[in-house]
Amino acid sequence: MPNITMGLKPDPVAPTNPTHHESNAAKEIRYRGVRKRPWGRYAAEIRDPVKKTRVWLGTFDTAQQAARAYDAAARDFRGVKAKTNFGVIVGSSPTQSSTVVDSPTAARFITPPHLELSLGGGGACRRKIPLVHPVYYYNMATYPKMTTCGVQSESETSSVVDFEGGAGKISPPLDLDLNLAPPAE
């Protein structure tokens, strides 16, 4: 019987120099919940343990930013039991703070400073609320006619704006409701 293995298909273009391939893998650190896009940016996502769905955390310029976004979301979802990329937060355990900071491996466990991640690429749980711009209606019939107060311009380069639409030519408003069907002709 032939030897059949299940899993990933072998790479058709295997590197001829295995040490070269290993050095590339050593340079590229892989973080939990982070994928590298083909164009070089990093995408972060996490699985919601309650809804069993993927939650999009955003696209980031560096893998570390994406990993921090994943860590923050993991702590929100799973609390202190969360598996994170950067270890425990400094100051969360006062008994270890003196020994961890003084140890030579402290850099591995110190969490980088908090970044404002909402500016980087949007969050999955936040919805953009459209801005409402005020709309001003200017009803000419309710305001007194504007006067120039004796100011006149002799310049040919100045422009004149007629707010009154002509003297005494105010048309009555249309009795029109756009929620109704158009009137029969």
Swiss-Prot record:
<feature type="DNA-binding region" description="AP2/ERF">
    <location>
        <begin position="30"/>
        <end position="87"/>
    </location>
</feature>
<feature type="region of interest" description="Disordered">
    <location>
        <begin position="1"/>
        <end position="26"/>
    </location>
</feature>
<keyword id="KW-0678">Repressor</keyword>
<keyword id="KW-0238">DNA-binding</keyword>
<keyword id="KW-0805">Transcription regulation</keyword>
<dbReference type="GO" id="GO:0009873">
    <property type="term" value="P:ethylene-activated signaling pathway"/>
</dbReference>
<dbReference type="InterPro" id="IPR016177">
    <property type="entry name" value="DNA-bd_dom_sf"/>
</dbReference>
<dbReference type="GO" id="GO:0000976">
    <property type="term" value="F:transcription cis-regulatory region binding"/>
</dbReference>
<dbReference type="GO" id="GO:0005634">
    <property type="term" value="C:nucleus"/>
</dbReference>
<keyword id="KW-0936">Ethylene signaling pathway</keyword>
<keyword id="KW-0804">Transcription</keyword>
<dbReference type="GO" id="GO:0003700">
    <property type="term" value="F:DNA-binding transcription factor activity"/>
</dbReference>
<dbReference type="InterPro" id="IPR001471">
    <property type="entry name" value="AP2/ERF_dom"/>
</dbReference>
<dbReference type="InterPro" id="IPR036955">
    <property type="entry name" value="AP2/ERF_dom_sf"/>
</dbReference>
<protein>
    <recommendedName>
        <fullName>Ethylene-responsive transcription factor 8</fullName>
    </recommendedName>
</protein>
<feature type="short sequence motif" description="EAR-like (transcriptional repression)">
    <location>
        <begin position="176"/>
        <end position="182"/>
    </location>
</feature>
<comment type="function">
    <text>Involved in the regulation of gene expression by stress factors and by components of stress signal transduction pathways. Transcription factor that binds to the GCC-box pathogenesis-related promoter element. Acts as a transcriptional inhibitor and may regulate other AtERFs.</text>
</comment>
<keyword id="KW-0539">Nucleus</keyword>
<comment type="similarity">
    <text>Belongs to the AP2/ERF transcription factor family. ERF subfamily.</text>
</comment>
<dbReference type="Pfam" id="PF00847">
    <property type="entry name" value="AP2"/>
</dbReference>
